[in-house]
Structure formats: structure tokens, C-alpha cells
Amino acid sequence: MTILKWALIFLVISVVAGIFGFTGVSAASADLARILFYIFAAIFIVLLILGFTIFRA
């Protein structure tokens, strides 16, 4: 898999975690989902930058 495909996968994961975290599903899962959202959003941004710079085919 290319690095940009991984970046898109982490984007989808972060959006799903954001939906569960920011819509108020429950207090316990909302905190975990918010943390996961920020982690996967950061991974997405890093992989996106790497995909357009270092890992360009």
C-alpha cells in the first residue's frame, strides 16, 4: 500500500472517531473517541505530508 492510501485510511478512522466523540454518544466512549480522533488525525496529517514529499514515487 502506498503511503497516501494509509493516510486516507487514518482519515476515515479519525472521522468515525470524531463522529462518536463529538456527538455525545456516552461520556465514557466520548472521551476515548476524542483522544482517538486527535491521534488518528495527527497520523493522517503526518502521512499526508510524507506522501507528498519523501515517498513520492
Curated annotation (Swiss-Prot):
Keywords (A to Z) from UniProt: Cell membrane, Membrane, Transmembrane, Transmembrane helix
Membrane topology type: Multi-pass membrane protein
Subcellular location: Cell membrane
GO CC list: plasma membrane
InterPro entries per the UniProt record, alphabetical: DUF1328 (IPR009760)
Residues annotated as transmembrane: 6-26, 35-55
Family to which this protein belongs: Belongs to the UPF0391 family.
Record-given protein name: UPF0391 membrane protein RPD_2934
Organism of derivation: Rhodopseudomonas palustris (strain BisB5)
